[in-house]
Amino acid sequence: MSLCSACTSPASHQLLLNCQGQTVAKSHSSADAGVSLVSGRWCAWWPEHCSESMFPSQHPVLSSNLADSSGQGRSPAGAHPALCPFHKSPWFPHFPQILPREWSWCGPERPAGCSLGLKAEAALVGKK
């Protein structure tokens, strides 16, 4: 059985993953799972224990989208330079159930772009 289970929310077109009790989210559009709510980009959040070996490999959709054209971005250690600490987002207070040591990655977007994604998902994640 997979350590991570997924469920979708048609209303907001977001994919939520519960990985070993921690909630992480990846924004996507209804037409393209690789397109985010943030300026056409996508964002992913995951706890440190959701490593590449147990996270993307068990989710084909994320496996194809968690890497940029150079193959980076699959984990905090080898991800895109635009990685930003999750807890520095102004929307972190909306996620008391998520540890500050988590990270968010918004591709070429800057940390400010990450906060936009968090704002969009605050209500949905808070209801789970």
From Swiss-Prot:
Domain of life, per lineage: Eukaryota
Protein name, UniProt field: Putative uncharacterized protein LINC00574
Lineage: Eukaryota, Metazoa, Chordata, Craniata, Vertebrata
